């Protein structure tokens, strides 16, 4: 299938849920194989799922892929999914600006993205993830979501999904709560916060994808 990882993960998670709803073991088996692979092979060491390669992230769309792994865990309780969610939480909590928007400097598809409501329940397995979910929600544009993927209707649907699957528990501080923090990725990129200033640096070299209208040079 020639498509992006977030699409492929959405197809697989829809097949998984459909398999449980309609009692189709073959659907469950096929989707489980795909989503388990997303957990153990397709995720980069820094916690993201690259859209074109593992050489760098696609910050906004990564929320979509994360959501499908979170759904997969809810139905399978695969421990590898839990590990993948931990890595994803670490990635997103570091690479989110103080206003809740994902860092665009390292993004190879979108220069700007709104505050995402996708997959907060995936973060909610962990104390810092629950705090991160609350942080994102606090920046949701209550007068109308015109910037994130899908706009109002998509975000409202994702909020409902978060309510359905959310894991309550204690919270722990995240980088946005700190006066200063710095984080370096395994690839040549990182972020630093000093007071009210946040600076992201990137030396990512990702080869251009031929005839791909969605690719942005980093």
Where are the regions a protein language model picked out?
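Aromatic-lined, polymer-binding surfaces characteristic
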Residues: 1-83, 108-117
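Extended polysaccharide-engagement surfaces of secreted carbohydrate-active enzymes
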Residues: 78-218
């Amino acid at each position: 299938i020639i498509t992006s990882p977030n699409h492929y993960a959405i197809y697989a998670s829809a097949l998984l849920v459909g398999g449980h709803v309609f009692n189709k073991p073959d659907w469950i088996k096929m989707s489980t194989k795909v989503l388990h692979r997303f957990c153990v092979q397709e995720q980069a060491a820094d916690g993201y799922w690259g859209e074109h390669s593992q050489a760098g992230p696609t910050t906004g769309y990564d929320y979509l892929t994360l959501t499908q792994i979170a759904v997969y865990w809810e139905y399978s309780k695969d421990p590898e999914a839990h590990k993948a969610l931990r890595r994803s939480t670490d990635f997103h909590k570091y690479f989110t600006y103080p206003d809740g928007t994902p860092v665009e400097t390292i993004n190879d598809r979108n220069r700007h993205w709104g505050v995402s409501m996708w997959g907060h329940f995936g973060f909610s397995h962990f104390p810092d993830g629950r705090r991160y979910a609350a942080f994102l929600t606090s920046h949701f544009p209550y007068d109308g979501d015109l910037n994130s993927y899908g706009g109002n209707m998509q975000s409202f649907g994702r909020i409902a999904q978060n309510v359905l699957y959310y894991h309550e528990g204690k919270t722990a501080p995240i980088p946005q709560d700190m006066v200063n923090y710095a984080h370096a990725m395994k690839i040549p990129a990182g972020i630093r916060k000093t007071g009210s200033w946040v600076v992201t640096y990137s030396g990512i070299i990702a080869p251009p994808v031929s005839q791909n209208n969605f690719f942005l040079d980093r």
